[in-house]
């Protein structure tokens, strides 16, 4: 089986973490994320030409709102299973509540229709004002 790095441009759903992914699926995707056999470097220059490693470390840093250097200091010398475990925990903590809310909202068709109607009314007002300004700028009069 060929392992691939997580990527939003890939067609496969297994290549990225989606907002609606549940806990088990997030863990599975992170476990299967491609890495190399070397341990995690403790300095940024140790990530040179280690794209998969850099990708996972970058995701961990971003989801936890910390610098890559801090991640390398924390995980340097350790194997990737340690980072993947912590990354899964962080992603689950951040993403699962969003997915739960999305699923809840998608079930409430009345609420969604109300939001769509409100948005349509706002867009209509903006469009009418823009059209009025355009007519004035180019010197046309609108016949009603």
Predicted region positions:
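Conserved nucleotide- and phosphate/pyrophosphate-binding catalytic cores
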Residues: 1-144
């Amino acid at each position: 089986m060929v392992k691939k790095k997580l990527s939003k441009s890939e067609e496969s759903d297994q290549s990225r973490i989606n907002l609606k992914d549940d806990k088990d699926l997030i863990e599975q995707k992170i476990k299967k994320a491609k890495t190399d056999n070397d341990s995690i470097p403790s300095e940024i220059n140790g990530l040179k030409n280690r794209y998969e490693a850099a990708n996972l470390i970058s995701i961990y840093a971003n989801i936890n709102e910390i610098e890559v250097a801090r991640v390398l200091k924390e995980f340097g010398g350790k194997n990737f299973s340690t980072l993947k475990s912590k990354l899964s925990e962080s992603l689950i903590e951040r993403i699962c509540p969003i997915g739960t809310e999305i699923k809840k909202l998608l079930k409430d068709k009345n609420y969604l229709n109300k939001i769509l109607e409100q948005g349509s009314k706002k867009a209509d007002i903006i469009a009418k004002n823009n059209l009025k300004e355009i007519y004035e700028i180019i010197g046309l009069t609108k016949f009603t």
